[in-house]
């Protein structure tokens, strides 16, 4: 889900922290992926430079071409090195025959603790929501108190969905919040209208499901595993069109399977309430919904931001529950097919 469409939800504190293995550091897990991204920058059509305050800037679509593979790798960085993203063929939404498929061994920490775009960064006319493992070092969001997790890493990596380089004031804020030197900050910039931006947004399909489960007050500590997929939409030079398509990919084409502990009835209830179909705003391309609310995200039903189809398996009971469904016709209408 495009980062502008997300919102901070609240839920009761977890009874157990998600970092059951305290030695896990998102910053440490992601470091090899970031190093490889920078090393392969030319092949990935990225531009790497030192920006404001000597922060490392990775341009994945502003002046650089970027591409699908760059977006795939950036999506894995967003997951804090705890997940895998693959581009796989499908016949479900022809001619849009490629899915971003996401899996992670630690869905709560990877998706909510890292990938979720929850850190608001603003200065002057600049605004972006930060996602990625650096959020867990700053831990400015109340979410981290609920997760019982904070990273003590010394290298900060954030992904920003933006078409402009952040000003020095934003770098200063990140450095202060994370207690690091600005030169230890890496900012990966992925415009919504770029190929890399498209992939890394669509690859949030599992995160969107976790975020809604959080909003529905489902106990996050009961979520053991998860996989998800959504179709890769064509980018558009028009921001609103690009933003609408990336949202529609998840709302009408997203598929998520969660594996949970606890009563089978709770799994069934989650499956019923989780799909986008449960929202009052379901049924039109997101661009039309957004325009109908005068381009104000806060007027859109927050329950809309969820995958099209959801399966929840109660692993302690061997029962699975599926709700929602795909809308290939609406996908084609949104994508331009």
From Swiss-Prot:
Alphabetic keyword roster: Cytoplasm, Hydrolase, One-carbon metabolism
UniProt-listed Enzyme Commission number(s): 3.5.4.27
Source organism superkingdom: Bacteria
Any one of the GO BP annotations: formaldehyde catabolic process
Catalytic activity of the protein: 5,10-methenyl-5,6,7,8-tetrahydromethanopterin + H2O = N(5)-formyl-5,6,7,8-tetrahydromethanopterin + H(+)
Pathway named in the protein's UniProt entry: One-carbon metabolism; formaldehyde degradation; formate from formaldehyde (H(4)MPT route): step 3/5
Entry's transmembrane regions: none
GO CC list: cytoplasm
Function: Catalyzes the hydrolysis of methenyl-H(4)MPT(+) to 5-formyl-H(4)MPT.
HAMAP family xrefs: McH
Protein name, entry field: Methenyltetrahydromethanopterin cyclohydrolase
